[in-house]
């Protein structure tokens, strides 16, 4: 049986206990839940390999192994599997009730734009707001951010063409999903996830996932996706919008 290693937690020596009846391995592991506590957590197919993707703040993952500062995980949001530095994860649990709708929001130590900054969170990050004071929201175990940068986690029906314009001039980063660097399929995934639509990570997965094929170019509509080898773009009105510069 052939599995896609990008989304299947099976290695030569170890596998998720969920696959015990399917594959034979030396060791089977019951996953432990963790949450990303950094602005993003890079994910690699192997330690030292090129970047595969990134998990954003607040996203949950299943941890199958933690060793020498690395964790072998599977994202619960898109099922991607890989190695990430353990320092980016926490076993603390959250109940996300909001998400970041702006390209980037700054985190402050107090509800004051003149306050000390602690970092940032990117579009599509998931947060638990525990208090609102004036124009600011307090994110659990993190700090304050402008409330205008957040929407309720169940909010949807956003125009992803308009949202994609926030990324204009964002650097291209292979495997990126963060606002500091992103690739084409990462952007498309973020735009669908912000509308609470499950969406796979890579272009080949996305092309299979999108079932309605447009036969003629004249039939393309705003918001349609166009695929070619290794790339994806979205149609903006009558023009093709390339998400990032490669």
Model-predicted regions and their roles:
Residues 239-246:
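Single conserved hydrophobic/aromatic residue that forms the stacking wall/gate
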Residues 23, 35-57, 101-129:
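Beta-loop motif signature
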Residues 3, 54-84, 119-148:
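SH3/SH3-like beta-barrel superfamily modules
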Residues 1-28, 75-101, 140-163:
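Boundary regions of SH3-family modules and the immediately adjacent low-complexity/disordered segments
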Residues 172-222:
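Catalytic cysteine-centered active-site loop
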Residues 103-105, 109-115, 119, 123-172:
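Surface-exposed beta-loop interaction hotspot
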Residues 55, 121, 219-220, 226-227:
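Short, well-ordered loop/turn sites that connect or cap secondary structure elements
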Residues 230-237:
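Catalytic nucleophile-His microenvironment captured as a short glycine-rich beta-strand/loop
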